[in-house]
Curated annotation (Swiss-Prot):
UniProt name for this protein: Gamma-glutamyl phosphate reductase
MF (Gene Ontology): glutamate-5-semialdehyde dehydrogenase activity; NADP binding
Superkingdom assignment: Bacteria
Main location class: cytoplasm
Chain's role: Catalyzes the NADPH-dependent reduction of L-glutamate 5-phosphate into L-glutamate 5-semialdehyde and phosphate. The product spontaneously undergoes cyclization to form 1-pyrroline-5-carboxylate.
NCBIfam families: PRK00197.1, proA
Catalytic activity from the UniProt record: L-glutamate 5-semialdehyde + phosphate + NADP(+) = L-glutamyl 5-phosphate + NADPH + H(+)
Taxonomic classification: Bacteria, Bacillati, Bacillota, Clostridia, Eubacteriales
Source species of the chain: Acetivibrio thermocellus (strain ATCC 27405 / DSM 1237 / JCM 9322 / NBRC 103400 / NCIMB 10682 / NRRL B-4536 / VPI 7372)
Pathway: Amino-acid biosynthesis; L-proline biosynthesis; L-glutamate 5-semialdehyde from L-glutamate: step 2/2
Length: 431
């Protein structure tokens, strides 16, 4: 079957899926969770095959970490599905209701985007997270995973397909593409695919953005910052920075650059270095940092680099304004955190840093759809159009206007025999 035929099938199925009821969708999600646990041994076996082959092919260590899909990760995705089941169905919610005139009522109502094309590297958990979010939000999904995860992706897509068809979800709502050549053809399928969401490396995402006819939602970089202000609590700062950098390094919300106010740097940097040394983190720093702790020099490129590894660049800054300027110059608009006891400085930081997620006194690792209570996420968007930050169910919806009349025609209003009232109503769409 050609990719255009597969995309057409998903498009057709998405129209029927958009009308599926909440009970049916939740029943399908429950069945997916059940089958994932029942067939976990098959999944782990397939993943071990992918890991072994990828090690032989010298896949980079950060990608190997993302590729691993063991029992703990299976439990995590099942937890995400269970959280998703508990969330309110976002489809069919009335956002606005207006009485245009007597008997003529306008409603703005949420609906699925249609067909979402997901192109992702390494992470099999992304396949489960994204497909279940698409299911709950009523969207069809066309998946293209990396060749390094082909066996894991294949079994996961098979399980999800079987689980949903068993309970009566329209068949063909989900399809997995399996050859590298499919990507470029997929990016031209604007007739069938409504949105592309890429998950992967900087180069990978930029390639998708540069070569797609279809709107792309996502982020190319995860260059996240922590800024330790002069009014910070040192113990708190160390805990937050260590967590932001080392809790899991191979993810887009891990901190890559640390900014430290010059007045607190002599106190906090030596203690912080000891804490990060114990986690085997390599530090590079500016000339002022090197005067305080023994580290290799940071280059201009370091400020622009997403390491996804045990490495952190450190810069001493003169004040809050310099920290904000650095973040807005070198950051990727993903997640940035200030550590301070000053409410005023925190407010300024959170207003002036141009990122989708801005934090005060907490780890950058919190920028995640599951942690935000979204059930899971299809990814992080640094775009300023449609969705920003962790994209959960709401980010997979658009809306349509539904107008109910009783023989109303525009000619009456053009001739001024009738006039518009435009009265706001607090009313749900009745159908």
């Amino acid at each position: 079957m050609s990719i255009s035929e597969m995309a057409f099938q998903v498009k057709e199925a998405s129209i029927r899926l958009a009308a599926a009821g909440t009970e049916l969708k939740n029943k399908a999600l429950e069945n997916i969770a059940r089958l994932l646990m029942e067939r976990k041994d098959e999944i782990i076996k397939a993943n071990n095959e992918d890991l072994q082959r990828s090690r032989e092919e010298k896949l980079a260590e950060p990608l190997l970490k993302r590729l691993k899909f063991d029992e703990a990760k299976i439990v995590d995705v099942i937890d995400g599905i269970n959280s998703l089941i508990k969330l309110e169905d976002p489809v069919g919610k009335t956002l606005l209701s207006t009485e245009l005139d007597e008997g003529l009522e306008l409603y703005r109502v949420t609906c699925p985007i249609g067909v979402v094309g997901i192109i992702f590297e390494s992470r099999p958990d992304a396949l489960v997270q994204i497909s279940t979010l698409c299911l709950k939000s009523g969207n069809g999904v066309l998946l293209k995973g990396g060749s390094e995860a082909r066996e894991t992706n294949k079994i996961l897509a098979q399980i999800i397909t079987e689980a949903t068809e068993e309970v009566g979800i329209p068949p063909n709502w989900i399809k997995l593409l399996e050859t590298r050549a499919d990507v470029n053809e997929m990016l031209k399928m604007d007739k069938y695919i409504d949105l592309i969401i890429p998950r992967g490396s900087n180069e990978f995402v930029r390639y998708i953005m540069d070569n797609s006819r279809i709107p792309v939602m996502g982020h190319a970089d995860g260059i996240c910052h922590c800024y330790i202000d002069e009014d910070a609590d040192i113990d708190m700062a160390i805990r937050i920075v260590v967590d932001s950098k080392t809790q899991y390094v191979a993810v887009c919300n891990a901190t890559e650059t640390l900014l430290v106010h010059k007045n607190i740097a002599p106190k906090v940097l030596p203690e912080l270095k000891r804490a990060l040394d114990s986690k085997n983190v390599e530090l590079v720093g500016c000339s002022e940092t090197q005067k305080i702790i023994p580290v290799a020099p940071a280059t201009e490129e370091d400020w622009r680099t997403e390491y996804l590894d045990y490495k952190l660049s450190v810069k001493v800054v003169g004040d809050l304004e310099e920290a904000i300027e650095h973040i807005n110059t070198y950051g990727s608009g993903h997640t940035d955190s200030i550590i301070t006891n000053s409410k005023e400085k925190a407010a300024a930081f959170m207003s002036l840093v141009d990122s989708g997620n801005v934090f005060w006194n907490c780890s950058t690792r919190f920028s995640d759809g599951f942690r935000y209570g979204f059930g899971a996420e299809v990814g992080i968007s640094t775009s300023k159009i449609h969705a920003r930050g962790p994209v959960g169910l709401d980010g997979l919806l658009i809306y349509k206007y539904k107008l109910i009349g009783n023989g109303h025609i525009v000619e009456d209003y053009a001739k001024r025999t009738k006039s518009f009232k435009h009265n706001k109503m607090n009313k749900q769409f009745p159908l």
